[in-house]
């Protein structure tokens, strides 16, 4: 299995300009749920090219973006400099070992990343540790629409991006968040319709991987096709599919 560091260092330039990541529909929902305040000290975990951090920066006191991929951080710093955003800092570090003291932040966010985390329970524990009492944690991530197709979804995602680990259901997220000590405040489904050709290009898929994805979709049963919203052209090729996304606000 490829590491997230390798995958995103390789594709950093594409992610910096990707409209899905830079301004996709989960971003305004995340910002609204976060209810940013001018006094907030914010941590953006797995910041990537800094899209969430740089959106929040004008609304808060300070934002730190954390990521394991140095090329992604370089893109974030370049954008901050180009846009003259001065209250951000981008640092290297793991979501499962956050390099900051206890109760350092009033708001933690993470967008389009936890499906890469092997130890989600450790990530949740670390977020709770660095949050101040009463602090907010807002996360947006891909989910599996139901437990019955979870295995198919993960195989599909991993074929496209070997650094993918697992897309959990909303029920699994609720259980793990509760165990970690969070209060579940609100959640909202934000489905994305993704063009297949764009999706495979974004990950740098090989021809073999694209063929395997076409085969998986072509042989999927009706339940999978319906829940994933897979659309085909007249030749049987994939046009697009629905990527189920959840945005949730938790509080310490």
Predicted regions located by residue number:
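Conserved Class I S-adenosyl-L-methionine
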Residues: 49, 184-252
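Class I SAM-dependent methyltransferase SAM/SAH-binding core
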Residues: 41-45, 49-97
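Short alpha-helix
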Residues: 166-180
């Amino acid at each position: 299995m490829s590491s997230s560091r390798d995958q995103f260092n390789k594709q950093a330039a594409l992610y910096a300009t990707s409209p899905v990541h830079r301004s996709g529909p989960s971003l305004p929902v995340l910002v609204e749920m976060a209810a940013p305040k001018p006094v907030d000290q914010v941590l953006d975990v797995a910041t990537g090219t800094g899209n969430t951090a740089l959106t929040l920066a004008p609304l808060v006191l300070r934002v730190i973006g954390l990521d394991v991929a140095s090329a992604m951080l370089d893109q974030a710093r370049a954008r901050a400099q180009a846009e003259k955003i001065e209250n951000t800092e981008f640092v290297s570090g793991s979501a499962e070992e956050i390099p900051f003291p206890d109760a350092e932040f009033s708001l933690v966010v993470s967008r389009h990343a936890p499906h890469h985390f092997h130890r989600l329970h450790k990530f949740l524990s670390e977020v709770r540790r660095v949050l101040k009492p009463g602090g907010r944690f807002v996360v947006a991530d891909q989910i599996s629409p139901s437990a019955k197709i979870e295995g198919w979804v993960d195989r599909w995602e991993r074929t496209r991006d070997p650094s993918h680990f697992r897309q959990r259901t909303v029920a699994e997220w609720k259980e793990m968040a509760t165990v970690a000590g969070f209060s579940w405040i609100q959640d909202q489904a934000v489905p994305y319709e993704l063009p297949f050709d764009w999706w495979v290009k974004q990950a740098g898929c090989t021809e073999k991987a694209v063929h395997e994805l076409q085969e998986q979709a072509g042989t999927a049963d009706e339940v999978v096709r319906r829940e994933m919203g897979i659309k085909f052209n007249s030749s049987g090729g994939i046009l697009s599919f629905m990527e189920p996304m959840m945005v949730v606000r938790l509080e310490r």
